[in-house]
Amino acid sequence: TAHLVKDIQVEIWKKFLFICTISGIGGLTRVPMGKIRSSAYLFKMMQDTAQEIFNVAKAKGIALTEKHMKSVFEAIQNQGAEVTASTQRDIMEGKPSELNNFNGYIVREGKRLGVSVPVNEMIFECLLPTEKEARS
């Protein structure tokens, strides 16, 4: 059954927060979710990535809350150990991906809004040569 939501932008950004967070780290590490979660360093990087996305959303006036952030990480924790994101798989297979629409968007919006996004920028810049190669 369908249901109405109070703020569609919040729903869109909740989904974007989840996808962008796992896609970038997955594309960079090229390992499944279980290995990312089991590494304290990589999991912290994932949290930092998500926090930057959250900060950009807030700067854009999106009404995301800490509760939304918590629910995204609950979903990440509930992913199977072998799960990979579709963008990650595209990167690993040398196919064009949504890197520019995900982490690239956060980098551009962060600069436009004066929000620091160093982790997303690092992910984007590290994966950009592979993305350009896939699109050539």
What are these regions (language model features)?
Residues 1-67:
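Internal alpha-helical scaffold of NAD(P)-dependent oxidoreductase catalytic cores
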Residues 45-136:
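NAD(P)-dependent Rossmann-like dehydrogenase/reductase catalytic/cofactor-binding core
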